[in-house]
A protein has these predicted regions:
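Substrate-binding pocket helix/loop in short-chain dehydrogenase/reductase
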Residues: 99-100, 107-109
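Conserved NAD(P)H cofactor-binding loop of Rossmann-fold oxidoreductase domains
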Residues: 91-96
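Active-site loop of short-chain dehydrogenase/reductase
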Residues: 6, 55, 84-85, 130-142
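Conserved glycine-rich Rossmann-like NAD(P)H-binding loop of the short-chain dehydrogenase/reductase
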Residues: 28-45
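Conserved glycine-rich cofactor-binding loop
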Residues: 7, 14-16, 38
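A short, exposed helix-loop element centered on a Lys and neighboring polar residues
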Residues: 123-124
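The beta1-alpha1 cofactor-binding region of Rossmann-like NAD(H)/NADP(H)-dependent oxidoreductases
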Residues: 39-40, 62-73, 105
Length: 142
């Protein structure tokens, strides 16, 4: 798939695999909107990527991925600014190294909210634009 002139949203794009994916997509000519858990983290990643690719279009947002309306609003705003979303990379996730017998319900909910509900919400929000134009790609990492 050619990435030139495609609009991609990458959740968890401020570090690790998400950041590397954003880097590769920008290198190939895509417009990248990355999400991070805080706007500060998103801004830092965007600044680093803009330094490397000064002519590229890259932006950072920090919706609450466990809240559908927060994600919808952020993705709709991104689409109105940069164009309909062509590619969604569901990469955001969290893990806990707590032994299972010490895992609390609160910890379980935190992990499920991002790792499961976050993927659902991002996919649901991105698919609105994709369905309207009749195409799109959704990738999920694990």
């Amino acid at each position: 798939m050619r990435l030139k002139d495609k609009v991609a949203i990458i959740t968890g794009g401020s570090r690790g695999i998400g950041y590397a994916t954003a880097d590769k997509f920008l290198k190939e000519g895509a417009t990248v909107i990355l999400t991070a858990s805080s706007q500060g983290s998103a801004d830092k990643a965007v600044a680093q990527l803009k330094e490397k690719y000064p002519d590229a279009t890259v932006a950072g947002i920090s919706p609450n991925l466990s809240n559908l309306e927060s994600v919808r609003n952020a993705f709709r705003e991104a689409a109105s600014k940069y164009g309909c979303i062509d590619i969604l990379v569901n990469n955001a996730g969290v893990s806990e190294s707590t032994p299972f017998t010490e895992y609390t319900e609160e910890t379980f909910d935190k992990v499920m909210d991002l790792n499961v509900k976050g993927v659902f919400n991002a996919t649901r929000a991105a698919s609105e634009c994709m369905i309207a134009k009749g195409q799109g790609v959704i990738l999920s990492t694990s």
